[in-house]
Amino acid sequence: MITVERVAELASYVRADGADQLASDLETADAGVFSGTERAMKLRFLLAATLRDERLSASTRTAIQTEWQ
């Protein structure tokens, strides 16, 4: 399972690529989440949405795809 620290790291990559809203969404992914399963589903959804953003650099995209798998 992805750690909070890793999510923060990915969010910083996304923010550096200019996708501030997506980075904020990743940083606050734990808000209102009550279980590990719910958190995992929410993060998977957010990572998928992030991958669709065309502003991401190749290195950011690769880092996110690694977590996606």
Question: What feature does the model see in each segment?
Answer:
Residues M1-Q69:
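C-terminal-biased regions
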